[in-house]
Each structure stands twice: as structure tokens, then as C-alpha cells.
Amino acid sequence: MLFSLALLFSPSQAAVFSVDLGSESLKVAVVNLKPGQSPISIAINEMSKRKSPALVSFNDGHRLLGEEAAGLAARYPQKVYSQTRDLLGKPYASAQKILNSMYLPFETKENFRGGMNLVADGGNENDSVYSPEELVAMVLGYAVNLAEFHAKIPIKDAVIAVPPYMGQAERRGLLAAAQLAGINVLSLINEHSGAALQYGIDKDFSNETRHVIFYDMGATSTYAALVYFSAYKGKEYGKSVSVNQFQVKDVRWNPELGGQHMELRLVEYFADQFNAQVGGGIDVRKFPKAMAKLKKQVKRTKEILSANTAAPISVESLHDDVDFR
């Protein structure tokens, strides 16, 4: 899909990049028009991975992004900011509900617009306050760095994929974040439209029409889109040609059903198991670091279950030096 997004436009510079920005992670693709370079490719991060954590962390006055921030998530859950895309354009109460449901122990306060600000560790200096737009801008800046390092040239033009349920307030927030990051957004495109373009770009529908359902379950949401593919007759350089086209017939989504919600079901189950194991009225949910450890291990277990019918789970020193197995 990223390839198709980047191909939608003819950039004024030598390259354009596209960003698939999710709640949990991001991917970056580059279309490079410079001679001798691969025209279309996925940018990899500092760990040689195609998918990067969409995370920002502030620790002792230092800012960390991506994989570096992910390395601190279990030790300092209150300092590693995730789900920032989902906080854009949200009223304070709605944004706080998202954080509470994910057991994210961030210090927050309501800003003058009725939205959320997050209070970050300023090290020896005073704590800093950031809006979701500013934090997303940092994540997008990280995406720019990945694209530019990959292409070996400066890139500022971008296409950003967004989920179909993202409203106008959220989209304005994302555009504001991109502007803060110095990105010239050529377009925001719905994820299912990008997927449909990717599917149909090299197919021939001159002799047939086709209905296709595109389904995606991400970290925090699920959607399905029904798309109709066909072709019409056109003219190119005076010759009759067949031109493919697609029409999105319908889209349905659930913004509260995703991989993280499955993980949270397991987290709740194992939290109850641990509470029963230690007794004494202890509730592990009240301890952010313990919950961060449990969430990390549950995610690993879920990934193992993707290819196996059973998987063990164990967390050393989950809380108060008590192991959980």
C-alpha cells in the first residue's frame, strides 16, 4: 500500500515518501526519481526493520524515538508515550479514557482548548508540557529521518495514510503535526483506498468487473471496505485505451477492536491470576511498572500464538520480587 500512496503524486523534488502511521507503529516508503537509485522501496530503521515503534520518550532531559524509546517502555512506562495518534483532536475526557483503558500512566492535564496535554520529564530542568500534535510531530520527524537516510537526499513531500474513521478534528491535528515536523503533506488518504490502489494498479479490468473486500485489523481498530473495480474506454495520444478505476461502495469499522484489545483481555486474565497467586488483597493493576512488564510479555505470547496452538507465559519479578508463571 505504501508504494501506491507514494505513486499518487509527481513531487517537485527528486523524491516523495509515504507514511503508514498507526497507533502502535509506522512504516515508511520512498519513491526516488534520482537516476541510479531504486525507484520504490521501504525504508528500514536503525534495527534494520521495516516497521518502527511510533513512540516518543523523555528521560533525564533526553528525547528518544522509535526503537530507542521502545527499550525503555517496561522500565519507565510513564515516560514512553504511545497511542499519540489516537489522542489527536480528542476532548480531554475522551483522550484520558483511551489512556486508562490501555493502562498508560501518563501525567496529563487539560489545555485551554479542552484537549489533552502531556507532562514530560524535563530532567534537571522543569517538566515540559506537550500536546498530542507536538508528540506526533516528533514521530513524523523520525519518519522523515528514516526516509532521508534511505534516499540519501532531503525529502519534505509526503502522503500519509489514515484510518477511515478518523474525523475532521483528528485529520486537522495530524496536518498540524506534519507542519510542525516540516512536512509538506500532498494528501491524507484513507488506508483502504491505498490498499485498493495497490491491488488494482497492475490488473486488467477491461473484460471483467470485480468486487473485493479489504479487511484490516490493526493495533487498536478493525475495518472492512467493499470496493468495485472496473474499466472505461479513454484516449491517450489519440489512441483508445482501457483505464482502470475503482469505487469504494461501503466501509465499516470498529475503532475499539484491535490487536491491543486482544492483549488487554489476556492482561486482565493474567492480572487476576497473579493477584490470586500473591493474595493479601494486592492488585497488580495499581502498579504501572508491573503492568508494563505484563503487557510486554503478553504481546510476545500473542505473537507466538500466531503460529502455535499453545505458548507459555512467565514474568520474572512482576511485582515486589514475585515471579509470575
Language-model segments: residues:
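Oxyanion-binding/catalytic loops of NTP- or PPi-dependent enzymes
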Residues: 8-99, 107-111, 124-129, 133, ...
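Bacterial N-terminal signal peptides
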Residues: 1-6
